[in-house]
């Protein structure tokens, strides 16, 4: 299973990361830094549907999405279009991401930034804060019975978080824990197939006072209008923007249709 491979390799990578920079070192650095914290949760609480635009070079299911990948250029484009937050892939092996992307994008983009990675260790939460992330992704399928502990740690660190769920059991767990932002992934992490109706199916297990983010398989303005019509608060769009990032006119038309009709 792809997810198992990613998690295994992430744990191996963390062994090296901790040798290079220990948790104590990170905590010490955090105590001496005045970090620019942006309110990710607030960006998703608008009357109209909010859009989180993603920056990623590759994915396990699609391979390299953009050969001419330039995170700074993409960050500048995202600064000047009608989106509400930015998601940045930092996973190295499968998505070809880097921690450094958050810092360099934050220099050219004023919107809240989500660190998109596979969190398996609390070390990564402290690391996320150090590298300038405003929010992190917590994947229920990865954390399982550790989800509540990790969610509480994000609160202590002043980080927002999206708790990602893929099935009824995970949706109920995230709701019971009290997770304020719940991401429903329309992609099945077992085989990476997608079905946008997954969001509607799982929403009924999430209390109405939570922020719901729909992730994956969102390709058209009509997809966004459909999701808004069923009560979704925000959508995360990655590949669709990455493949069309040079067509600024097309992206603006996409966003106008998605938001102006909402």
Curated annotation (Swiss-Prot):
It comes from the Bacteria. Keywords: Amino-acid biosynthesis, Aromatic amino acid biosynthesis, Decarboxylase, Lyase, Tryptophan biosynthesis. Its EC number is 4.1.1.48. It catalyses: 1-(2-carboxyphenylamino)-1-deoxy-D-ribulose 5-phosphate + H(+) = (1S,2R)-1-C-(indol-3-yl)glycerol 3-phosphate + CO2 + H2O. SUPFAM superfamilies: Ribulose-phoshate binding barrel. GO terms for biological process: L-tryptophan biosynthetic process. It is an enzyme of class 4 (lyase). Pathway: Amino-acid biosynthesis; L-tryptophan biosynthesis; L-tryptophan from chorismate: step 4/5. It holds the Pfam family IGPS. GO terms for molecular function: indole-3-glycerol-phosphate synthase activity; phosphoribosylanthranilate isomerase activity. PANTHER family: INDOLE-3-GLYCEROL-PHOSPHATE SYNTHASE, TRYPTOPHAN BIOSYNTHESIS PROTEIN. HAMAP family: IGPS_B (MF_00134_B). Belongs to the TrpC family. This is Indole-3-glycerol phosphate synthase.
């Amino acid at each position: 299973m792809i997810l198992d491979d990613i998690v295994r390799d992430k744990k191996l990578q963390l062994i090296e990361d901790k040798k290079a920079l220990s948790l104590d070192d990170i905590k010490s650095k955090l105590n001496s830094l005045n970090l620019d914290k942006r309110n990710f949760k607030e960006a998703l609480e608008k009357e109209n549907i909010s859009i989180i635009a993603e920056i990623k070079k590759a994915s396990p299911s699609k391979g390299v999405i953009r050969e001419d990948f330039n995170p700074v250029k993409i960050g500048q484009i995202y600064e000047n279009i009608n989106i509400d937050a930015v998601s940045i892939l930092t996973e190295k092996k499968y998505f070809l991401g880097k921690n450094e992307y958050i810092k360099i994008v934050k220099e050219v983009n004023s919107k809240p930034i989500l660190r998109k990675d596979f969190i398996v260790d609390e070390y990564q939460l402290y690391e996320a804060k150090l590298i300038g992330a405003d929010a992190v992704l917590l994947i229920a399928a990865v954390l399982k019975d550790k989800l509540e502990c990790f969610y509480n740690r994000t609160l202590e660190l002043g980080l927002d978080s999206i708790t990602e769920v893929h099935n009824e059991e995970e949706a109920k767990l995230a709701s019971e824990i009290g997770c304020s932002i719940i991401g429903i992934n329309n992609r099945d992490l077992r085989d990476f197939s997608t079905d946008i109706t997954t969001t509607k199916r799982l929403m009924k297990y999430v209390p109405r006072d939570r922020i719901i983010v729909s992730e994956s398989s969102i390709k058209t303005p009509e997809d966004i209008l459909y999701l808004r019509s069923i009560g979704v608060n925000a959508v995360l769009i990655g590949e669709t923007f990455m493949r069309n990032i040079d067509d600024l006119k097309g992206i603006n038309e996409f966003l106008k249709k998605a938001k102006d009709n909402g």
